């Protein structure tokens, strides 16, 4: 197989937005973790929350995709010149020849969690402004990214827990090798939600202090 070129890459996390911020945090030993103060969660643990996600706005035409996961996606796409390289690839290969392969565990499940709080007390119906397909659904991540760039080709979301963002690279490489696409947007996005926080707490895997996953005396992951 012909070696593939990674022509652009970026990272956004609790360490910061973009490669420079991430590198600086790593070199200075700043973790980005803080005591949990997310939503209504009451857990004695530390979490990594990306700053300013809630301030990110999606284009009006993509309002149905509005959720924290897709807001973080846009933040990442518009960092380190990544979106510019995507648009260059589209100009070179065409809208149908650039694929989207993104991994996620929970996608926009927070929207469902919040919607359940607003169910109709009589019928139990979810609110009319809740859009499952374009927020909670795992594919919403890939569909949003495809729509964001006006792409018309292959798009795939892989949701296999922690391996999701590794498997997408293999999936994209296979499609390029088969000649079905010429370039691909590859990566992974996950945002905080109640399911993840309470889920790991129920498994007794959270820690009341900043996690030390490789420490012999660790008390959580």
Where would I find each of the regions flagged by the language model?
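Conserved "HGTGT" condensation-loop signature of ketosynthase/thiolase-family condensing enzymes
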Residues: 1-153, 193, 201-220
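A short local structural element in Rossmann-fold oxidoreductases
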Residues: 197
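Active-site-proximal alpha-helical scaffold in enzymes
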Residues: 83, 138-142, 146-149, 154-188
